[in-house]
From Swiss-Prot:
Multifunctional enzyme that converts the viral RNA genome into dsDNA in viral cytoplasmic capsids. This enzyme displays a DNA polymerase activity that can copy either DNA or RNA templates, and a ribonuclease H (RNase H) activity that cleaves the RNA strand of RNA-DNA heteroduplexes in a partially processive 3'- to 5'-endonucleasic mode. Neo-synthesized pregenomic RNA (pgRNA) are encapsidated together with the P protein, and reverse-transcribed inside the nucleocapsid. Keywords: DNA replication, DNA-binding, DNA-directed DNA polymerase, Endonuclease, Hydrolase, Magnesium, Metal-binding, Multifunctional enzyme, Nuclease, Nucleotidyltransferase, RNA-directed DNA polymerase, Transferase. Residues 366-655 are annotated as: Polymerase/reverse transcriptase domain (RT). It catalyses: DNA(n) + a 2'-deoxyribonucleoside 5'-triphosphate = DNA(n+1) + diphosphate; Endonucleolytic cleavage to 5'-phosphomonoester. This is Protein P. Pfam families: DNA_pol_viral_C, DNA_pol_viral_N, RVT_1. SUPFAM superfamilies: DNA/RNA polymerases (SSF56672). Residues 286-298, 326-351 have a biased composition (Polar residues). Terminal protein domain (TP) is hepadnavirus-specific. Spacer domain is highly variable and separates the TP and RT domains. Polymerase/reverse-transcriptase domain (RT) and ribonuclease H domain (RH) are similar to retrovirus reverse transcriptase/RNase H. The polymerase/reverse transcriptase (RT) and ribonuclease H (RH) domains are structured in five subdomains: finger, palm, thumb, connection and RNase H. Within the palm subdomain, the 'primer grip' region is thought to be involved in the positioning of the primer terminus for accommodating the incoming nucleotide. The RH domain stabilizes the association of RT with primer-template. PROSITE patterns: RT_POL. Residues 363-373 have a biased composition (Basic and acidic residues). The record marks Y96 as: Priming of reverse-transcription by covalently linking the first nucleotide of the (-)DNA.
Length: 788
């Protein structure tokens, strides 16, 4: 072939080939797929696209990809109607045809620990994110409430009672870990674990007296709720009056003493406290609280196995003196994590002189009712409905662990339907961004948070909107649940704040995505020691690390976000490719597949598509079937195209070198003529077969220049062409154009400076005054990730 656009050479042969390719491109543009869209088939049992005689069982992939693409533009796939079709494609099935969960009566509830991060993290890791997390707020505009009896979904009709029993155990385990509130009444809930600062003002001293009256005290105001009997005077003159203040302990269900918040600062106020002991004796004590007194210390580490009673006073006559007790709601000292050690009792300094045997007998006598250990009562700034907003069911923890159960919480009413909410967006790296931020040639360590969502506390009023039940008790999420669309955004804020501080404090490259941390440093030994320091730093703040999923030592090859990452490249595991090729081989030509089955297939193809030589336009026929919810039929050429994509596996370089080549070819078009100009001075003018929209004529000339000259970049004065978004064009032409122009750069040049503007109007080209710019949008990368 003669050199293109050289005036000194005979370009008749070159022009003939260019004219031929231009007519082929025009035919693709003029052939419209609309006639083929949604054409119903004659009968479901008939293969309307039966394979020809001698059709090979496996796709022929020897031809180059460009030839396969051209063949797919001739032998087109088809869209069908909405009649029933095949629901299985290899091992894939429609979303409603997923393998049903099998109930396991031996399911074990996994160990769930108390995840309570220290609010000191706000000072240790300065960030504006904490104002959205301490506490997090969830305010739906409207809510649909369901009865308590509908709390557990009827996922297993043959094992309803067993299913509800295991769900009840699971919810109780979450309650014991401080993740749930348990409903007591319309205005009262109880929880376990260490209270947060914003919960202190709502804590209640809740205790029961023998006449059936339940007394709640919040912020110094007492409130009596009568059960049955009228009020009685139960203070006996011969009972001694002592102060028995306990911090963080509860003796009986609804029979507890709790120090509450004192909004009055240093004011003293007197109340009469009544203690209920199941032996029938009660003690009335006159107290004066002062927030200036010493604070009680609580070790809230383990659970108490032995039953605890309040330390009651002896039968000696009271002196009538008022004993000052500390108000501890604003100054509770606790250990880093956990609960009180078994057997310990926390009493005031004045009651330490009492005989322990006599003190314990009074409350341990006839202590048959169930006791709540280490619980707090809270009366939030909201009402606690005796209804639920989400439903529950259990599944296997994962495909490899079927002995443990996983709790699935369905709060889908907040993401779809009339109660749907618009959740905030947040920066999430795509593959292109990940390639540009990962450092090259550094050892890496990955960390994984344990129970990541359960680190995020909710405002008590927001918790009342997230109600679940096992059919007996109503629980509210005190920490963020996984079934709400707001939770990933909150987790992103949480890990981003931690990652920024880790990078600043330890001077290493840190990247966070959801509950995953990636640490990089040039020195492997230094990175190893730093990773231990990072784990200690996080654990001191009450943030739990899942060491089972954490890299024990620095490695060069790591699996992160589903990708296999080595020192210089990113790739996908070979097993994923083999599974996808197997699925494509099992496609039956001409058979009709249900659109939900195609939806799952497209999801798998999208994950591997960046690692192939294909583009998203190749999947548009399947997207059309999914959008219109109709059946889809593969053609032989289209199946070959998909198989060819999975054969052309490539690995992507980390930190690819960006080059800005100098433009040497320019194109321009009018409704009737198109021109290609070369920097050497040669040019060629072509006449279109018909008048079309100008953006299509411009794209035709750019594609022709790519086919005939194969430049590294092309100048064009069409923004439509430079942006490379061709969704509005017929599919086969859009696919070919995207395939041709993806590898090269397109620069925008104003029409007055376009060198090809003259030849398209039968004037000489002008390359003297050239002004151009790329229109591709720069990839957003956070500032802290740009430096390395």
């Amino acid at each position: 072939m003669p050199q293109p656009l050289k005036q000194s050479l005979d370009q008749s042969r070159w022009l003939r080939e260019a004219e031929k390719h231009l007519r082929e491109l025009e035919n693709l543009v003029d052939s419209n797929l609309e006639e083929e869209k949604l054409k119903p088939q004659l009968s479901m049992g008939e293969d309307v696209q039966s394979p020809g005689i001698g059709e090979p069982l496996h796709p022929n992939v020897r031809a180059p990809l460009s030839h396969v693409v051209r063949a797919a533009t001739i032998d087109l796939p088809r869209l069908g109607n909405k009649l029933p079709a095949k629901h299985h494609l290899g091992k894939l099935s429609g979303l409603y045809q997923m393998k049903g969960c099998t109930f396991n009566p031996e399911w074990k509830v996994p160990d769930i620990s108390d995840t309570h991060f220290d609010l000191q993290v706000i000072n240790e890791c300065p960030s504006r994110n904490w104002k959205y997390l301490t506490p997090a707020k969830f305010w739906p505009k409207s809510i649909s409430y369901f009865p308590v009896q509908a709390g557990v979904k009827a996922k297993y009709p043959d094992n309803v009672m067993q299913h509800e029993a295991i769900v009840g155990k699971y919810l109780n385990r979450l309650y014991e870990a401080g993740i749930l509130y348990k409903r007591i009444s319309k205005h009262l809930v109880t929880f376990k674990g260490k209270p947060y600062n914003w919960e202190l003002q709502y804590l209640v001293k809740q205790h029961q007296v023998p006449d059936g009256t339940t007394t709640s005290k919040i912020n110094g105001r007492a409130e009596n709720r009568r059960r049955r009997a009228p009020a009685k005077s139960i203070s006996r003159p011969h009972d001694s009056e002592r102060d028995c203040n306990m911090v963080g302990q509860i003796s009986n269900n609804r029979s507890s003493i709790r120090p509450c918040a004192n909004n009055g600062g240093g004011k003293h106020y007197a109340t009469t406290r009544r203690l209920a002991c199941w032996g029938g004796k009660t003690i009335g004590t006159d107290q004066s609280y002062s927030s200036r007194d010493t604070s009680a210390t609580v070790d809230s580490r383990g659970r108490s196995e032995s039953s605890r009673g309040f330390s009651t006073i002896s039968g000696r006559k009271a002196t009538g003196n008022h004993h000052h007790c500390s108000n501890v709601t604003n100054s509770v000292e606790t250990t880093t994590r956990g609960r009180s050690t078994p057997g310990k009792q926390v009493v005031t300094r004045d009651s330490s002189a009492l005989p322990e045997s006599r003190a314990s007998r009074a409350c341990h006598k006839d202590s048959s009712p169930q006791k709540e250990e280490n619980a707090w009562y809270l009366r939030g700034n909201t009402s606690w409905p005796n209804r639920i907003t989400g439903k529950l069911f259990l599944v296997d923890k994962n495909s490899r662990n079927t002995t443990e159960a996983r709790l699935v919480v369905d709060f889908s009413q907040f993401s779809k339907g009339k109660n749907a909410m618009r959740f905030p967006r947040y920066w999430s790296p795509n593959l292109s961004t990940l390639r540009r931020i990962l450092p090259v040639g550094m050892p890496r360590i990955s960390l994984d948070l344990s129970q990541a969502f359960y680190h995020l506390p909710l405002n008590p009023a927001s918790s009342s909107r997230l109600a679940v039940s096992d059919g007996q008790h109503v629980y509210y999420f005190r920490k963020a649940p996984m079934g709400v669309g707001l939770s990933p955004f909150l987790l992103h804020l949480f890990t981003t704040a931690l990652g920024s501080e880790i990078a600043r404090r330890f001077n290493i490259w840190t990247f966070t995505y959801m509950d995953d941390f990636l640490l990089c440093h040039p020195n492997a030994r230094h990175l190893n020691s730093i990773s231990h320091a990072v784990c200690s730093f996080l654990q001191e703040l009450g943030i739990r690390i899942n060491f089972d999923k954490t890299t024990p030592s620095p490695v060069n090859d790591i699996r992160f976000l589903g990708y296999q990452i080595d020192q210089k490249f990113m790739k996908i595991e070979e097993s994923r490719w083999k599974e996808l090729r197997t699925v494509i081989k099992k496609i039956k030509i001409g058979a009709w597949y249900d659109w939900k089955c195609i939806q799952r297939f497209v999801g798998h193809l999208n994950f591997v598509l960046p690692f192939t030589k294909g583009n998203i336009e190749m999947l548009k026929p399947m997207y059309a079937a999914i959008t219109n919810k109709v059946n889809f039929s593969f053609s032989s050429a289209y199946r070959t195209l998909l198989y060819k994509l999975t054969m052309g596996v490539c690995k992507l370089a980390i930190r690819p070198k960006s080059s800005v080549p100098l433009p040497r070819v320019a194109t321009d078009a009018t409704p009737t003529h198109g021109a290609i100009s070369h920097i050497t001075g040669g040019s060629a003018v072509f006449a279109f077969s018909k008048v079309r929209d100008i953006h299509i004529q411009e794209l035709l000339m750019v594609c022709l220049a790519k086919i005939m000259i194969k430049p590294r970049c092309i100048l064009s004065d069409s923004t439509f062409v430079c942006h490379k978004r061709y969704q509005t064009l017929p599919w086969h032409f859009a696919m070919l154009a995207k395939q041709l122009l993806s590898p090269i750069q397109l620069y925008f040049v104003p029409s007055k400076y376009n060198p090809a503007d003259g030849p398209s109007r039968h004037k000489p080209p002008d390359w003297t005054a050239l002004t151009y710019t790329p229109l591709s949008k720069a990839i957003y990368i956070p500032h802290r990730l740009c430096g390395t």
